[in-house]
Amino acid sequence: DCCIIAGCPFGCTICC
């Protein structure tokens, strides 16, 4: 999902 791709350990709403 986008969180993994963005390298962000938080929710997609926060990261993306």
Swiss-Prot record:
It comes from the Eukaryota. GO terms for cellular component: extracellular region. Keywords: Disulfide bond, Secreted, Toxin. This is Conotoxin ar3e. It is found in: Secreted. GO terms for molecular function: toxin activity. The cysteine framework is III (CC-C-C-CC). The keyword Aminoacyl-tRNA synthetase does not apply. It comes from Conus araneosus (Cobweb cone). Disulfide bonds join 2-16, 3-12, 8-15. Belongs to the conotoxin M superfamily. Expressed by the venom duct.
